[in-house]
């Protein structure tokens, strides 16, 4: 059974996030201030980028939509990753798949802060402090309410929490129905906790910080249902039934933060769910595509690097008289090149090493379908 559709959706998700950041967030004075660009720098936004931050009622917010697709892909492939290995082996492989690449890319992002400060003669951002870095390295910064150094690793922190939660539930029962019953029970408690956190606690309370990511994690469980249906562990009718319950829990949890059912996050994640569902139904029609497959292969380092590298390069290029369109195209080209290098010389070797380490720690895994292997990357 093919899973190529999910792998190629990584490319669509990554491009959606890049467009959102380059055509939208880049023009935010607050973001430019964080990286060290002076307030006097105020680039003009071209007409084709105007809709990105002002999509209108019900409009598509590229970045939110793209992250939603990433979360569904993760929910879909994590059960595949656990299919033939122990929970311990899974967690070891997840560590090596995520953290070394993340740390390497974080160093590149950190260097961009120094380059920006040197070029513009501005003070270094507080995000370059040792304290900030130490809290960001383990991807636990969201628990303390700290923003991401690279603007994007907050979603990676969500995924790490999901991996741990899913692995613990998986230990309790591998049967699909038992897994989902336990998951729904857990998500229901989280939904109630999120409501209490938003209505009876301060935004900075520990309960609020601990439950802030549950709207994302609940949504990720929807991706698991596609796996169970694909591998015939659930009938389509059963998957739809469980999906309806989890989707309602997602809407209710998101509403605790957005103030109403169907806010921008819930709406755009629903768009992501519609796209993923359509691609799942049409999965047999997906074929090799050099562009999509390449972007999907490097999507993890591309996602981690595009914001800080792009923001700094675009500002410098525009300051030298380069038009915005050429500036973002050149910056994207540089980011693609660097991401490819990280993928080839860091991500692939480290993943291979992680598999060797996990095999030494436990029983060697049974063979997994070849077409499922590329999907193990993150985000």
Regions found by a protein language model. Give the residues of each.
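Generic structural signal for small/hydrophobic residues in well-ordered secondary structure
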Residues: 10, 18, 68, 75, ...
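Small-polar-interrupted transmembrane alpha-helices in polytopic inner-membrane proteins
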Residues: 14-16, 179-198, 242-248, 335, ...
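Hydrophobic alpha-helical membrane-insertion segments
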Residues: 12-26, 99-117, 302
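Membrane-proximal cytoplasmic C-terminal regulatory module of class A 7TM GPCRs
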Residues: 348-379
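Hydrophobic alpha-helical transmembrane segments of polytopic
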Residues: 6-17, 60, 67, 102-105, ...
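Membrane-interface helix-loop-helix regions
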Residues: 33-65, 98-160, 177, 191-193, ...
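Juxtamembrane transmembrane-helix termini
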Residues: 62-96, 104-122, 309, 314, ...
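Alpha-helical transmembrane segments in multi-pass integral membrane proteins
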Residues: 2-5, 19-41, 45-61, 80-84, ...
């Amino acid at each position: 059974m093919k899973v190529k559709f999910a792998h190629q959706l990584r490319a669509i998700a990554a491009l959606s996030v890049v467009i959102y950041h380059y055509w939208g967030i880049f023009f935010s004075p607050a973001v430019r201030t964080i990286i060290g660009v002076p307030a006097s720098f105020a680039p003009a936004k071209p007409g084709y980028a105007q809709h990105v931050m002002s999509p209108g009622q019900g409009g598509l917010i590229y970045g939110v939509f793209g992250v939603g697709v990433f979360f569904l892909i993760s929910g879909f492939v994590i059960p595949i990753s656990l299919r033939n290995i122990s929970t311990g082996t899974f967690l070891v492989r997840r560590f090596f798949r995520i953290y070394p690449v993340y740390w390497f890319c974080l160093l590149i992002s950190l260097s961009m802060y120094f380059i920006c400060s040197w070029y513009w003669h501005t003070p270094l951002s507080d995000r370059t402090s040792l304290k900030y870095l130490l809290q960001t390295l383990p991807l636990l910064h969201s628990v303390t309410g700290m923003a991401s150094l690279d603007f994007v690793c907050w979603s990676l922190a969500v995924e790490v929490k999901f991996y741990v939660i899913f692995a613990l539930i998986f230990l309790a029962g591998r049967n699909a129905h038992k897994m989902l019953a336990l998951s729904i029970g857990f998500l229901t408690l989280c939904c109630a906790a999120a409501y209490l956190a938003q209505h009876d606690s301060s935004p900075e309370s520990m309960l609020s910080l601990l439950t802030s990511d549950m709207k994302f994690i609940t949504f990720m469980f929807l991706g698991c249902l596609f796996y169970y249906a694909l591998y015939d562990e659930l009938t389509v009718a059963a998957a739809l039934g469980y999906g309806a319950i989890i989707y309602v829990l997602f809407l209710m949890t998101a509403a605790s933060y957005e103030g109403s059912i169907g806010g921008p996050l819930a709406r755009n994640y629903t768009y992501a769910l519609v796209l993923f569902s359509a691609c799942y139904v049409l999965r047999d029609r997906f074929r090799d595509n050099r562009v999509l497959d390449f972007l999907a292969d490097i999507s993890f380092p591309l996602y981690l690097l595009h914001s800080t590298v792009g923001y700094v390069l675009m500002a410098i290029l525009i300051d030298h008289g380069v038009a915005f369109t050429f500036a973002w195209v050149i910056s994207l080209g540089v980011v693609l090149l660097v991401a490819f290098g990280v993928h080839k010389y860091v991500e692939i070797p480290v993943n291979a090493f992680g598999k060797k380490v996990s095999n030494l720690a436990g029983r060697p895994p049974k063979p997994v379908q070849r077409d499922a292997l590329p999907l193990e990357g993150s985000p």
